[in-house]
Amino acid sequence: MGEPIGRVTRCSTQGFVGAVRQLDPETPTFGTLCKAEAQGGNIYVVGAVYDISIEDDPFARHVASSERANSEQIADHVVNRQTPIEISAIAVGYIKDEKYFFSLPPQPPLTMAEIIPLTDAEIIAFTAGFEFIPTLINFRNDELTAAVLRAAAQCRPESEQHYYLQGGGRACARLLNEDFVRLETLIQRIKP
């Protein structure tokens, strides 16, 4: 299991929002697949990160607006202060008894549940059949759909990545067969 990247602060069956101590260059990123425990550990809700926001605070505004913010003030704010960073994730499925389900979870995670990025092996298993795509298509954030597909492709051996993206494009085409403009834009975004 991966290292936690934050804790749930708000949640519903549609998704969850979590607080993150600080941004790591690798996670969380837009499109990261992560999970949070629900039902007392009986299930894990799988979410796709669709927003990362860094809230300001009065001290940050004060330092940023000063004519000469010295490096010590900036370092103190970046390293020592609790910068309010939030990630928002849409629920794209859940894990129960090591099986993947591609519907909304029966219950949301509880507040303070750890948010853990899926491992490469979990991402490969969860994204293998493209069953998660309808939820993303219905969320109407094509950038997110493309980001999740590209990230899932990157977890696979290099020789499989192109074929995986083609399969993802076909799955999107079946769902968007009456919206060619949106489909064409999405296909362009899927390209690595």
Question: Model segments located where?
Answer:
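Charge/polar-rich, low-complexity and marginally structured segments
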Residues: 80-192
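Short, well-ordered loop/turn sites that connect or cap secondary structure elements
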Residues: 26-29
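Short beta-strand-centered aromatic/proline hotspots
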Residues: 4-9, 32, 43-54
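Short, solvent-exposed secondary-structure boundary/capping segments
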Residues: 15-20, 55-68, 89
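Short, basic/aromatic beta-hairpin or loop at an interaction surface
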Residues: 1-17
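Charged substrate-recognition surface patches at the periphery of nucleic-acid/ligand-binding domains
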Residues: 49, 57-80
